[in-house]
Amino acid sequence: VYGGQAPFVFPANNSQDDIAALKAIAEANPLNSDLRNFISNKDYLKDRGSNDGYNVGVTWNTESTSRVKSFFIDDGRTQTVTTMDVSALSGLEQLDLQNTRLKSLDLSTLTKLRSSSLYGNDSLTWFTVKLPNSLPENFWMNGYTTIMAGTPVDGNNAYAAAGTEIDLSAYATVGGVKSVYQWYLIDRATGKRTK
């Protein structure tokens, strides 16, 4: 106690439904040690963001029964997250998924969702993400998915001979918005982009 002031810590009343949903996500991805540790160490009770050096985390809102406000996974280390049911996280406002192996994602029940970042997820495309019917005016969604075209060299690279036609017509527009493509020429010896 300093100067007549004492710190107070109020026990959180975290939503048991949200905790059960987080546990179910971990159970559905048994090969992911980050999710397993997140649950077994009860790290889900701590607010932590994606910039805090962790691969999995949540923040809770300040309602009397706290709901998960944000949830993130960066699965770049193991790439073992293959399924994700976030439908029970009804208070979710921000979702950040990176480097997973998800093939689809249903966000349709998340009516409070304000932003979603989906970077480097194996085959998750804008076609395979189901959004809520009614989105907030300033909804923010960003990210990228690498689509292999040509002959694969490894899990991240492919090549195509000059003049090879690559059909991307299926990805020309998403929800009426034209897609943007970036092409790179990589020096295979150095791995550096030349064009």
Positions of PLM-derived features:
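An anion/pyrophosphate-binding glycine-rich loop and adjacent beta-alpha core
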Residues: S115
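Tandem repeat domain/solenoid detector
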Residues: G91-E93, R101-S104, T109-K112
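N-terminal capping/linker segments that flank leucine-rich repeat
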Residues: V1-S90, Q94, V129-K195
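Canonical position 11/12 of the leucine-rich repeat
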Residues: R77-T82, T100-S104, D122-T125
